[in-house]
Design a protein with these regions (language model features):
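Bacterial N-terminal signal peptides
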Residues: 9-19
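Periplasmic c-type cytochrome electron-transfer domains
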Residues: 4-7, 21-332
């Protein structure tokens, strides 16, 4: 009896499973999968490092300062504020779902999250530290020495372990179960009529040529300003990495997941509202001027891409010891 029921249950699951996959497969956007295969001990350690401002020269700036997980993984300002209140050159993209990206940074200069994570600690305009000093700080904190030993099995902390742990934590920062994903997975009443019409416009106008896949972006580099040039603060974009002039003004297509939370928009953070961003995209990328109503529907659709935000207890960081090098918040 029990086995028979189990078999029926399995058959039903298998059937539903295929139906779900087929429904999602015919759309250019796929639902986000919850994080799988993460090392939980490493995630906990990486979470602490992500929130630890002692990895910065000032002792004041952590990853979370610019990628605030209470605010969609961004800082919600046009360009970031770094060490000594320096104004950064470019808008901070969200860390949410960044594990789905083809590469990291607007110009894709880091291949993956691990490579990316070493950058900001040593960037003079961001955390302004050195990897050696960051390791000295961690090695002086007994709580960290214990935890690194548990996770990596050695008494000696190095930058490779630090970036590995941060990247592992970042893998958990995905946002499944948005209303749009529920719709993709078969819940037909998850979207309103306006939102569905917005999605249809998004597809039929050609937005999906660049914003597609699980991340609704993040998987290719494209020119900003195909039909009309972008008038904002332009940098070289992808050409800075490839040295190829054809890649000028090419940027990694940003993910549109949680886009309602990640304002202001574009690499220079010049536009604050989705209404403006959709208008700019329509005109510059597709040569299309949307009516007010069309624009509002696309915006309504974009807002259905907000998923479940990562939930966890705020990590409590191990205290410094008498030997911990002191922060230098005001220069020196
Ligand atoms: C002072 C602000 C600041 C701090 C601190 C900071 N970042 Fe960033 N982060 C940025 C900016 C700005 C960019 C975009 C830079 C670029 O593309 O050239 C970025 C890019 C990224 C990206 C790439 C996302 C994408 O879609 O390309 C990831 C991932 C990331 N940061 C993670 C981290 C981690 C992990 C830390 C801590 C070790 C950190 N950041 C610290 C501002 C900051
Ligand atoms: C040819 C490729 C392409 C097409 C087509 C395209 N986009 Fe984009 N989209 C991009 C790129 C590249 C960026 C980043 C540009 C930058 O920051 O300079 C972007 C940025 C955005 C942003 C800002 C996201 C952020 O976090 O800054 C929104 C919103 C957006 N697109 C929506 C749309 C909509 C809606 C359409 C259809 C009307 C569309 N896009 C069509 C490539 C494209």
């Amino acid at each position: 009896m029990k086995t028979k029921l189990t078999r029926i249950a399995l058959a039903v699951t298998a059937l539903l499973g295929t139906a779900v996959i087929q429904a999602a497969d015919t759309e250019p956007i796929q639902p986000i999968k919850p994080p799988a295969n993460v090392n939980l001990g490493m995630v906990e350690l990486g979470k602490k490092l992500y929130f630890d401002p002692r990895l910065s020269k000032s002792g004041f700036i952590s990853c979370n300062s610019c990628h605030n997980l209470s605010m969609g993984g961004t800082d919600n300002i046009p360009t970031s504020i770094g060490d000594k209140w320096q104004q950064g050159p470019i808008n901070a993209p969200t860390v949410l779902n960044s594990s789905l990206n083809v590469a990291q940074f607007w110009d894709g200069r880091a291949a993956d999250l691990k490579e990316q994570a070493g950058g900001p600690i040593a960037n003079p305009g961001e955390m302004a530290f050195t990897h050696t000093l960051a390791i000295d700080v961690l090695q002086s904190i007994p709580g960290y020495v214990r935890e690194f030993k548990q996770v990596f099995g050695t008494d000696k902390i190095d930058i490779d372990q630090v970036t590995t742990a941060i990247a592992e934590f970042e893998k958990t920062l995905v946002t499944p179960n948005s209303r749009f994903d529920q719709w993709l997975l078969g819940k037909k009443d998850a979207l309103t009529k306006d939102e569905l019409e917005g999605y249809k416009l998004f597809k039929d106008s050609g937005c999906v040529a660049c914003h597609n896949g699980e991340g609704v972006g993040g998987n290719s580099f494209q020119k900003m300003g195909i039909v009309e040039p972008y008038k904002g603060n332009t940098s070289d974009g992808r050409a800075a990495v490839t040295g190829n002039d054809a890649d000028r003004f090419n940027y990694k297509v940003p993910t549109l997941r949680n886009v309602e939370m990640t304002y202001p928009y574009f690499h220079d953070g010049a536009y604050w509202t989705l209404t403006e961003a959709v208008d700019v995209m329509g005109r510059l990328q597709l040569g299309k001027k949307f009516t007010k109503e069309e624009n509002a529907r696309i915006v309504a659709f974009l807002k259905t891409l907000t998923g479940e935000q990562p939930k966890f207890l705020l990590p409590i960081l191990p205290p410094s010891s008498d030997k911990t090098p002191r922060p230098t918040p005001f220069g020196k």
